[in-house]
Amino acid sequence: MTTTRFPGGVHRLPTLGLALTLAIGFAWATAGRPTRTSDDPPGGKVRKLILFDGKGLDGWKKTESFKAGGVKVEDGAIVIEAGGPMSGITSTRTDLPTTDYELSFEAKRMSGDDFFAASTFPVGKSFITLINGGWGGSVTGLSSLNGADASENDTRRFVKYRNGTWYRFRVQVTDDVIRCWIDDKETFAVNYRDQQVKTRLETRSNQPLGFATYRSQGAVRAIEIRMLTAEEIAANNKAAER
């Protein structure tokens, strides 16, 4: 991303009416609940959200932006076509956590030379974007902290992304720290507690969670959110002290 680029009596109901009422009530009560997975403890809180099943775009919408490219599912991945300049997808879910969670996904740049899966996600009451391959193809970091973009703040890293290659990203968010890995290699850990956390205007339409490309065609798959354990939260807070 460059500086210039870039939801009284008692009355008895008939049996059929009562059943219908109960069914509607149950549907309302369960709407929007996370899908339980094999990783969730029986009877306990849901610990993992599967945000993309590899088959369709349920739970997602095309991000509206100027001359945005198309979005489709192909070979088990969401393909985001190149736009003029940006394209993207945005989650329509209302049950996303805002802290003590891990967002993980796999992404590749199919063509182009800029960011191909910039991921916007919740951080407490705000949001931030992980840029991957911005500013000409290699800058990786958070936009924005204290108004400084990924190319200007302490999270800036230079990563060489090869077109056609899948990369695995993991981002963990706690009340104090945002920590990132690429292909299981820690990229950065930053304490944001006393910093202003905010997205750039260009990725604000990806809130609460979404992905964006810049003059590049990208693909995203295996999108999940997992709640962190107490041990992981403690480890994250220590990681930012190094």
Segments predicted by a language model, with ranges:
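A short alpha-helix capping/helix-coil boundary motif
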Residues: 1, 18, 146-148
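N-terminal secretory signal peptides that target proteins for export/translocation
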Residues: 1-11
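Coiled-coil-like amphipathic alpha-helices with heptad-repeat character
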Residues: 6-7, 28-32
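Bacterial N-terminal signal peptides
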Residues: 17-27
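Carbohydrate-interacting regions of secretory-pathway proteins
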Residues: 30-242
